[in-house]
Amino acid sequence: MRLMRNLMNALLLGAAASSLAVAADRDGEYRLNELQSTDAGYRKAWQNLVEDESRLPDWVMNLSGTATPMHAVDDQGDKYLVGGLCEKSDCKGQRLLVAFDWDKSHAYGLYVQVPEGLPQDKSPSKHASFRWLGKPEPAVQKILDEQLKADPNWY
């Protein structure tokens, strides 16, 4: 009987670990430019953010640029789905980094613009303009800033 109980516990633990691994892998299935059409919660959070912002380009308003896979970020128990997007014709000069609360209630962004024609020997990070969207708290700002700095072309 004890053997059967141990076997059942092992099976349950294995199933739980497997489902956690699948959930962790699924975050990479999403891309920022697909979220609005696939999930009403993300769409509403993004619409709430952009309605309070002025003078944003269409590709930012509609999340219609070129996107990288999104990933989960856990910051001391607060979880976010984070991803990046850039303007299709100007990925080096026009970027957007976005974090959604895990419950999809809020979206936050970092809109980054690098001046056109910046010489290759100039650091984009020293010449860029940064605009926070959605009034992110310092912890979310740090997450988005780290996402930007993780790009090997950002120096």
UniProtKB/Swiss-Prot annotation:
Swiss-Prot/TrEMBL keywords: Disulfide bond, Periplasm, Signal
Locations listed in the record: Periplasm
Family designation: Belongs to the ivy family.
One CC-aspect GO term: periplasmic space
Top-level taxonomic group: Bacteria
Pfam families attached to this UniProt entry: Ivy
Signal sequence segment: 1-23
Organism: Pseudomonas aeruginosa (strain ATCC 15692 / DSM 22644 / CIP 104116 / JCM 14847 / LMG 12228 / 1C / PRS 101 / PAO1)
Keyword Secreted: no
Protein name: Uncharacterized protein PA5481
Database matches in InterPro entries: Inhibitor_vert_lysozyme_sf, Inhibitor_vertebrate_lysozyme
